[in-house]
């Protein structure tokens, strides 16, 4: 049986993550309150951020920026803003 969580991002009960994907207290908070679906949405945004801003995960400043954006996205509902990105128009 799948583990469920009250997802703060989706605002509803949904299937939870299978294991803690992020270290520390923040990782525990994500595991306890973020669903697989919400984590998948974050991963798409994270990929865009890394690519568009040319972030280097070996750089601590870049890692800090990504973590801040992750918290804003998952827990405060703020979308990731990428300068110059225009989403494709639906067909």
Swiss-Prot record:
Pfam families assigned to the protein according to its UniProt record, in alphabetical order: Iron_traffic (PF04362)
Gene Ontology terms describing biological process: cellular response to oxidative stress
InterPro entries assigned: Fe_traffick_prot_YggX, Fe_traffick_prot_YggX_sf
Disulfide pairings: none
Keyword vocabulary terms for this entry: Iron
Superkingdom, taxonomy of origin: Bacteria
GO molecular function: iron ion binding
NCBIfam families in UniProt: PRK05408.1 (NF003817)
UniProt protein name: Probable Fe(2+)-trafficking protein
Organism: Shewanella amazonensis (strain ATCC BAA-1098 / SB2B)
């Amino acid at each position: 049986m799948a583990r469920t969580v009250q997802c703060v991002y989706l605002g509803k009960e949904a299937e939870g993550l299978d294991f803690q994907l992020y270290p520390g207290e923040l990782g525990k908070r994500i595991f306890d309150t973020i669903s697989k679906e919400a984590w998948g949405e974050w991963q798409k945004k994270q990929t865009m951020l890394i690519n568009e801003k040319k972030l280097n995960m070996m750089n601590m400043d870049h890692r800090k920026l990504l973590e801040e954006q992750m918290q804003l996205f998952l827990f405060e509902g703020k979308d990731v803003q990428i300068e110059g990105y225009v989403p494709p128009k639906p067909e």
